[in-house]
Amino acid sequence: MALPLKKSEMICFYDVQYRWSKRSTNQFVEVRVELNENPHGQMIIAQCPRIFREDMVEDIIEKGRELGWKPEVTADPMHVRLTKRGLIARDA
């Protein structure tokens, strides 16, 4: 499902545009990232620390690509967790 335009922000990372949104829960901040040109591609859903900075989105994109995230392909969302040691894959 594509991110809503009004409640999401755009980021350009290595000349590719992504759209992202965040949602706070009691335990963490959930960040969803998708390719702006293909909103129906694979989304990455990251659990981040409660103290969230916008530059963490770049880490999610970069490390997600290294873990096999392919936003240009239609697939189930990839679930990850951002920790002090980096991005780790987790079960959905």
Where are these regions (language model features)?
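Short, charged/polar N-terminal "headpieces" of proteins
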Residues: 1-26
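Ser/Thr- (and often Asn-) enriched beta-sheet segments in non-cytosolic proteins
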Residues: 10-12, 17-19, 32, 45, ...
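Short, surface-exposed, low-complexity cationic segments
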Residues: 21-45
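Acidic, low-complexity intrinsically disordered segments
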Residues: 40-92
